[in-house]
Amino acid sequence: MNSPLAHAIPDVQNSEDSRQIAINKVGIKSIRHPVKVSDKNGGVQHTVANFNMYVGLPHNFKGTHMSRFIEILNSNEREISVESFEPMLREMVKRLEAETGHVEMTFPYFINKSAPVSGVQSLMDYEVTFTGEIHEGGRYEFTMKVVVPVTSLCPCSKKISAYGAHNQRSHVTVTATLNDHLWIEDVVQLVEGQASCEVYGLLKRPDEKYVTERAYDNPKFVEDMVRDVAGLLNKEVRIDAYAVESENFESIHNHSAYALIERDKRIEA
């Protein structure tokens, strides 16, 4: 009995490419998958992450095998965690016969916060990205990116005004290359402590009074926030390299204020 699968199907991807040009990254982008992430309190958060998965393609291959990325992500019906991140990446590089690989996993992470006066609790969400890379020679590198919403209040506005000062919500983003485990909560707490005031999911009137006055008593330019955060990141031994950036969504302008500091401690060592 003849079957369509009885005859060999050509593997076009494995055929030789005459242009002889290597590709740095090729793969799949924006695929969602359930993940689990351990929190600092000993619990596990179940969430959904957006994945980008790439490998380097040698100059002599026409294409990569796109279906294998999906197979790796879904293998054993497992949920991806930070603990399984490196093994998954190494499996991807091996199965696709590549020397380099890159996986990004972006997901919402929730922290239960208590309001500063009433103590009422509510969830705050933070955008987190885990990035793993396999470099030539097999070296693994892990980077964590956390976007932290905060409040900033303008020192100049406070100084020149008879009363009040303009303030706004800001996003402070820390991207850190790690040499050891660092909790998401630690990064959030570090950033929030350097803002004019924290942002909360739920506030009662006494809390609203507190955060308004707290921001007024603690004005920060966008430059101040990135410098203050960078000063603490410089002391964190679990971080090899970092970028800290702040975008202030100005309340009196139709544009944002922005600042960025980057440092690689490994180069300076």
From Swiss-Prot:
A GO BP annotation: tetrahydrofolate biosynthetic process
Record site feature (May be catalytically important), residues: C154
Enzyme Commission number(s) from the entry: 3.5.4.16
Gene Ontology MF, one: GTP cyclohydrolase I activity
Keyword NAD: no
Keyword annotations of the record: Hydrolase
Pathway: Cofactor biosynthesis; 7,8-dihydroneopterin triphosphate biosynthesis; 7,8-dihydroneopterin triphosphate from GTP: step 1/1
Pfam family membership, one: GCHY-1
InterPro entries: GTP_cyclohydrolase_FolE2, GTP_cyclohydrolase_FolE2/MptA
Catalytic activity entry: GTP + H2O = 7,8-dihydroneopterin 3'-triphosphate + formate + H(+)
Family: Belongs to the GTP cyclohydrolase IV family.
Record function comment: Converts GTP to 7,8-dihydroneopterin triphosphate.
UniProt xrefs under PANTHER family: GTP CYCLOHYDROLASE MPTA
Protein name (Swiss-Prot/TrEMBL): GTP cyclohydrolase FolE2
Species whose genome carries this gene: Azoarcus sp. (strain BH72)
